Amino acid sequence: MSATLNDDSPIVENFDANPDDIKKPISAKTVAGIGERMIIIPKITKIDNPDEAVEKLVTNFRNNKFGIVILVPSGSAANRWKKVNATYAETSEQVDEYVKSLIERKSYGPYVFANRYDGIDLPSDSCRILIVDGLPKQSGEYEKYASKVLTGSSFLSSVISVRIEQGIGRATRGRGNYSVVILTGESLAAWIAIHYDSMTVGTKSQIKIAFDTTKEIGTTNDLINMVNQCLNRDQNWVNYHAQELAKLTDLPPPEIKKIDIADTMRKAFNFADNKQYDKAIAKLNSITSSDVDNNIKGIAWEFKARFAYFWGNAQDSEKYQKDAYELNNNLLRPKTPPPYQRIPTKSKQAELVCQKVLKYQFRRGLIEDFEGVIANLNPKVSSNSFEQSLKDLASFIGIESDRPEQKRNGGPDVLWVFPENKALVMEVKSLKKPDNAFVKRDFGQLLVSMQWFKENYPEFQALPVSVHSNNKAEAKLSIDNVYVLTLNSLNSLVSEIKAFLIEVCRDELSSADLIVTCEGSLKSHGLLYKHIEKKYIRKFEKA
């Protein structure tokens, strides 16, 4: 059993439960009986340095006999909290020891526990301030697999939501209990902003209550004063929280579509387990032929490929795997990849930016998402991480992008396609030493990528661009039609994009005002193709 199961479909898929029963759950009429949590997300307030503010808050309250616990995803993430003299529990025995000490009121922390989102209870005074720092990591091989192949899917959102809500619930164990829960770390704030709807009704309500009451917080003192309202039992806060929760009488119905998909998967697995592979494949047809998320549909095709292989039909197996890979490039690559699918280029940049902004429940969460992306745009990370971040960067200014080489062993590392039939064909050399020049091999790769581009986008004009540490090329190269985006120029572009996002992510902008603001800001910040080409892309010079 779990108090935070916000998606019932795994009960069907994992335990072969009767789907008709799962569609008619016994549930409470309201969420008014859950514990009181003041959930604060400093990253979506107006505080200039949210991380520093949270650290000062811990220092302020550590001697006030309020139990303080910090949950982090890993041991390495605990290092941050050394500066506030928090005690890290390195072993399970230490976790038990520190939890017992908190419950018996022999100590007040702050204690740091790694990957302890469930399995510990910290009721009443044992923990009045709970800090969840960073996005929980996958626990177990299946979740690690799912995080890779189901990126962005509702299934993965549900898995992470459960982990977050389990963590949030460590300090509030029932009705009549109360605590302050601070959600910090760029990845966590951004994730909640975009996946808000995947959380349970009670948690969503408490996050919204906190957002409405804390969005104007601008200083550390404001944050401390807000926390004191909960800890000192300020009646205005207590009554407001209770009234807002009491309004939630319409709980969401079960997600019938998810349950039906889970039931189909379970029945297909049962057939396969009995070596009835033909029936297993036939069962999955209802998913592969339906209008469902491409990630889920891709997995169904991949299972069909496996079942066909076990059945001795290698030809169908290869065909099914091609269909799977075409829908979800994170799945196994078939022996012969399917033809390249061009990325769409019909929408205007401003329209795509608006669509992205409106996906976030709290618009400032988009900026935290952006910060997470640009963290990998430095020469110290792997080339794969750098290329993925360069691809993702495009979406923040409404540019369609792709990684053709990663998908099909052909084409450029990164492709940015603009709505005016223009493109940047990019080969990334982020791991080169700062003084290394652009050489013949690099030149050859760009030429091959440009040939690929002309074959797949014949009506487009493109610039061959090397993302390189400097703008120096070997003297013997003919570099008249080859361009460079230096790491310094990339950093300048990133800074301009951030300034643009701060402008368009204001919560007071209506949807109609947002599109107008996006159009104007893209021009004023120089983020259209003609601006980027002129300001950030330059020609190589002879070394």
Spans of features found by a protein language model:
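Interdomain/boundary linker segments immediately adjacent to catalytic/signaling cores
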Residues: Q321-A324, N328-V381
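Interdomain hinge/linker at the junction between the two RecA-like core domains of SF2 helicases
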Residues: M1-N60, T213
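Conserved RecA-like helicase motor-core motifs
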Residues: P19-I26, G67, K82-V99, E400-P404, ...
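Catalytic core segments in nucleotide and nucleic-acid processing enzymes
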Residues: Q94-Y98, E104-K106, V132-G134, S158, ...
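Long, largely alpha-helical accessory region at the distal end of helicase-like NTP-driven motors
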Residues: S76, G174-W301, A308, S510-A543
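Conserved strand-helix element at the start of the C-terminal RecA-like helicase core
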Residues: N60-V84
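Conserved RecA-like P-loop NTPase helicase motor core
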Residues: S101-W191, K432, K454
